[in-house]
């Protein structure tokens, strides 16, 4: 008897979970949530780019250990500080426009990194500050995702958007090989 009640209770819980999952996807805007995830993912790839490339860059420019550490830390610190600026932009311009402005800076920075002269340490630090704009993606992606979902689903929405942190692993896996292949 108790066993049957337990099975019945478990079945009802599974049904509720299925309903919750279904209602989550109906409650918000999945394309915006996926866009927030990809925005976050790509931003994280760019933000941490100097870390996976540090060995190659430090060998090419004969950087000291301290210089290499500063080079890797600069985009992280800049990103942390630029989140405040990006947050203000998000509040005034809304996430889409603020994100577009951020991406223009990021694309310009990547173009300079690829085609420009980064033969001096100061140039690397400047690039690091500019790449920090990608680190401000928190202030764009999270409001973009959460504004489309009611409070009871915001944890799930933010979890999905926040999974864009996986961009750090993707950068570590692919950036060194791409740098060797394309410069």
Give residue spans per PLM region.
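Cytosolic juxtamembrane N-terminal segment immediately preceding the first transmembrane helix
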Residues: 2-39, 43
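Extracytoplasmic
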Residues: 31-63, 86
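Residue-level signature of mid-helix packing/kink "hotspots" within the transmembrane helices
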Residues: 48, 76-84, 136, 169-170
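Helix-to-loop junctions at the C-terminal end of transmembrane segments
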Residues: 82-94
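Primarily marks hydrophobic transmembrane alpha-helices of the MFS/SLC 12-helix fold
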Residues: 96-99
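C-terminal ends and interior cores of transmembrane alpha-helices
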Residues: 104-118
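Cytoplasmic helix-loop-helix junction between adjacent transmembrane helices
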Residues: 127-164
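Helix-loop-helix hairpin linking two adjacent transmembrane segments in secondary transporters
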Residues: 161-183
């Amino acid at each position: 008897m108790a066993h049957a009640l337990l099975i019945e209770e478990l079945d009802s819980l599974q049904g509720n979970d299925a309903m919750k999952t279904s209602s989550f996807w109906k409650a918000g805007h999945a394309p915006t949530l996926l866009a927030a995830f990809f925005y976050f993912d790509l931003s994280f790839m760019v933000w941490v780019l100097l870390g996976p490339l540090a060995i190659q860059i430090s060998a090419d420019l004969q950087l000291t250990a301290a210089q290499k550490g500063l080079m890797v830390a600069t985009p992280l610190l800049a990103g942390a500080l630029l989140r405040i600026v990006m947050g203000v932009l998000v509040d005034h311009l809304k996430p889409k426009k603020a994100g577009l402005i951020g991406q223009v800076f990021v694309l310009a920075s990547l173009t300079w990194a690829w085609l420009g002269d980064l033969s001096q340490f100061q140039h690397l630090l400047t690039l690091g500050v500019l790449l920090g704009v990608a680190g401000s993606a928190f202030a764009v992606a999270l409001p973009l995702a959460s504004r489309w979902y009611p409070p009871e689903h915001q944890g799930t929405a933010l979890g999905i958007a926040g999974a864009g942190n996986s961009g750090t692993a993707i950068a570590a896996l692919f950036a060194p090989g791409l740098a060797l292949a394309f410069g």
